[in-house]
Amino acid sequence: MGRISGLVPSRFLTLLAHLVIVITLFWSRESNIQACLPLKFTPEEYEKQDNQLVAALCLTLGLFAVELAGFLSGVSMFNSTQSLLSIAAHCSASVALSFFIFERWECTTYWYIFAFCSAFPAVTETALFIAVFGLKKKPF
């Protein structure tokens, strides 16, 4: 039981770290958008890239809501497999998004980070929701 109780705060902290970096990216997305564009770009091209990045960030926040709902409701709080997956994904996302912001990576890179570090844990969280509430299985 000691390992599981150690996973709970670790998972919560990595979720919050990823969330803080995504919110920071909302504030400082201009440099990343400019990295996606050629040296001379039109306002329409800028707005298109901005809309794509904002859509990706909004999807990420929606998936955070799914994960936090499952975690805080207790559905997956003590599931060690989901906790380890979530810790690995969100820790990786925190590091990758830090590089994304500071190194001004292209916007298409965000979709890879999104798929592996936000969507995959949210899908497994949804599967746990279905198992617990639909199939009436124990969450751990």
Swiss-Prot record:
One of its GO terms (cellular component) is ciliary transition zone. It is a multi-pass membrane protein. Glycans are attached at residue 79. Keywords: Cell projection, Cilium biogenesis/degradation, Glycoprotein, Membrane, Transmembrane, Transmembrane helix. The keyword Transmembrane helix applies. The chain crosses the membrane at residues 7-27, 53-73, 83-103, 113-133. The keyword Glycoprotein applies. Pfam families: TMEM107. It is found in: Membrane; Cell projection, Cilium. It comes from the Eukaryota. GO terms for biological process: cilium assembly; cilium organization; craniofacial suture morphogenesis; detection of nodal flow; determination of left/right symmetry; embryonic digit morphogenesis; neural tube patterning; non-motile cilium assembly. Part of the tectonic-like complex (also named B9 complex). Interacts with TMEM237, TMEM231, MKS1 and TMEM216. Plays a role in cilia formation and embryonic patterning. Requires for normal Sonic hedgehog (Shh) signaling in the neural tube and acts in combination with GLI2 and GLI3 to pattern ventral and intermediate neuronal cell types. During ciliogenesis regulates the ciliary transition zone localization of some MKS complex proteins. This is Transmembrane protein 107. It comes from Rattus norvegicus (Rat).
